Amino acid sequence: MTSARDWIRSRCPEALAAFEQAGAQTLADYAAGFGADAALPRPPQAADDLVELAAATCARLYSPDLGQALRRELESDLHALTANHHGVDFHPEFFQGDLLFAMSCRHAVPLFNCGAVPANNVAYPRGILLGCGTPEEVSFRSRKLPILPGRDRHGLISVRPAFTAAEVILPSQLSGQPEEPHALDRLVQAVYRHPRVLEQQTFRDQASPMNALLWQQVIPKSCDLPPLVSLDMQWLCGRLITADLEQPDSLVRHLLLHPPLAAAIWDALNGQRACWTGDAQGLQRGTFLFWGVDGKGRALALRPACDFRSLVAVRDAGWRLPLDARTLGRALTEERILPSLFLYFATVTAARGLRCAGGIFQTSYLPRMIRGICTALRHCGADGPATRIAGAFRPCPPCTGLLPLRLPCPDGPLRQTGRGAGAADLWLAGGLSPALWQSLRHSRVDHALAASLPYH
């Protein structure tokens, strides 16, 4: 555990400091820090369009009533959990992060998830994750039950086609599996083959109700938790950017269409986590502003041209994207580009003031993104917007990464302390009970951190 603590301290000192400082707090008290601070100055742009878009999308994918619940949540507290990959949250870190964030919510639990990740990412969106082995063996080990075909697994979630009922594989049909996959057939039927899921036209839209259905399966109404709303952040952000390109004073329009500002952004954040690393010879890591999407739905890393008036694909010399409003709007509509993580936070947090709860890495990189944007604006003489952005932002304590919910570990030596539970593990154990939920709410942060360290 000491080495794990040192690992977090070396890579995410802000996250570990936040956990340690809040050690004596209950998780419920700690979660209060995920809420927006109404006393802060207003950001450069109002968030009305973000709230309206999220509520309308929720009404379309879930129900009009849930759309109104999400609207009430965001209007009373402009916050969202942004740590997860878009899919079904079987992963222990994502599922338990959802539970912790839910402690800060009243009407709905807003998840704005990253869809610009391939289908074979760590969250395993094409199947179920079950706990396996012990945390000491590796940082996180799980057994994967493939529910959907493996084709297109390198394609991005945001542009992945919808699956059909015939493509859903029941766990009992998989060879060489122990007994519990047969019990999981009921969970798969309730989540993957639900009519609301199968009527959606894209995997992106299927993942939203699937996550809510899993939430309902694992968490009974008696626990009195708000409903879960899971939306693709890249899709939401793309719609906002398209509108911002038509607004002369919007931050994103200036960032995308003003080459000196784009160049200053490149310099300010070059080499930072979740941004990009590159030089005149090329791009070594990340992408600049957008991800390109190739003909197979896979990601293309983009670098700026020398004049910062276009973006060029690193792996495809013939792929070029002029940075003008008409071309960008069309490319977003046709899903030939997806907003990067940086551009997402520039659009919703820097410009509109959305408070984003995230994981241990976001605790470090989001404040650096905000500082980088402000540095670039001041470099270009835009001191006023930089001051407003800096004044409206306060770092959010880390959310995803604590694993307070433990279940027995029959296949390893952790029978006393248990193993971090994912959604399927908890479902197999009978689901969340009101008593367990209250116990979680009153657990201490330092105890949850100690239980989580073997997984890092």
Predicted regions and their residues:
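Internal, well-ordered alpha/beta segment that forms a basic, Gly-enriched binding/recognition surface
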Residues: N113-N211
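Glycine- and acidic
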Residues: L78-G87, H194-Q201, T347-A357
